[in-house]
Amino acid sequence: MATFDLRNTPSVTIPAPVQLRNVVRQFGRQRVIDGLDLDIAAGEFVALLGASGSGKTTLLRTLAGLDSIDSGELRVPVARAAVFQEPRLMPWKSAWKNVVLGLRVNDAKARAHAALTEVGLAHRLNAFPATLSGGEAQRVALARGLVREPKLLLLDEPFAALDALTRIRMHQLIIDLWRKHTPAVLLVTHDVDEAILLADRVIVLADGKIADDIRIDLPRQRDSGQAGFQLIRSRLLGLLGVKGAEPDTAPQASAPDSTFSELRRVASAR
């Protein structure tokens, strides 16, 4: 049997599952995405910030296959799923049937049960959407995405309509599921703190172009009182045009945000 010495074998570079090269999307004369270059690595969590009209949702829809591009090159995994601000559940179908909607497999109910168990809703398997809370409905939508075993998970402001405590619980759930399943994630959000708390990178989009791409090196589990958090926050707010923000000179927080920390403590205890 032949043997091989791999010590001097060059390492193989695995291409990023998401690659955009000079991508353009325009409506009439307006370029909503303007010559965009972007890579998202396997298992990487990226948050996308930007003012209204900056191109965030158009970019997400393009990656989801819901919109086309006018020019450039786009590479995305075939296995991808999207979760939107509205859960988009079929009201006449039970939770488990919503989870496997469009999925043609013999063990559909078993897969739905497994996915709902992962999001803490095994007991709501046969519940109808009208009986679900807002947080429960979003968890069903998340289970619907996970059951497809996506290599790319797209999140379009999925927590925007939730109360503060439910948002924090959903943040932790997303992180737990991301660590377990390791998809690449793109989160579109207007919430700067949310972006810093969850992402490996935060990209700021302006007029269809990347205004900044910031690596978040803060250790997890993150808190707004961590050294460096407020500096990153001020930089992002400055990029978003928030008056009074000083991206390069903002002081770091001297103490944790007590309200935020208390909410996280309560959420973790339940």
Swiss-Prot record:
Query: Any idea where the ABC transporter domain is?
Result: 18-232
Q: Where is the composition biased (Polar residues)?
A: 251-261
Q: Name one GO cellular component term.
A: plasma membrane
Residues that hold ATP according to the record: 50-57
Its UniProt entry gives the catalysed reaction(s) as: ATP + H2O + aliphatic sulfonate-[sulfonate-binding protein]Side 1 = ADP + phosphate + aliphatic sulfonateSide 2 + [sulfonate-binding protein]Side 1
Q: What is its EC number?
A: 7.6.2.14
On whether Iron-sulfur is a keyword of this UniProt record, the answer is: no
Q: Where in the cell is it found?
A: Cell inner membrane
How this chain sits in the membrane, per its record, is: Peripheral membrane protein
The highest taxon in the source lineage is Bacteria
- Map out region (Disordered) in residue numbers: 247-270
Instruction: Show the GO MF annotations.
Output: ATP binding; ATP hydrolysis activity
Keywords, alphabetical: ATP-binding, Cell inner membrane, Cell membrane, Membrane, Nucleotide-binding, Translocase, Transport
The keyword Zinc is annotated on this UniProt entry? no
Query: Where in this chain does the entry annotate a coiled-coil region?
Result: none
**What family is this protein classified in?**
Belongs to the ABC transporter superfamily. Aliphatic sulfonates importer (TC 3.A.1.17.2) family.
Function description: Part of the ABC transporter complex SsuABC involved in aliphatic sulfonates import. Responsible for energy coupling to the transport system.
How does this protein assemble?
A: The complex is composed of two ATP-binding proteins (SsuB), two transmembrane proteins (SsuC) and a solute-binding protein (SsuA).
Supply the name of the protein.
Aliphatic sulfonates import ATP-binding protein SsuB 1
UniProt source species = Pseudomonas syringae pv. tomato (strain ATCC BAA-871 / DC3000)
As recorded in Swiss-Prot or TrEMBL, the protein's gene is named: ssuB1
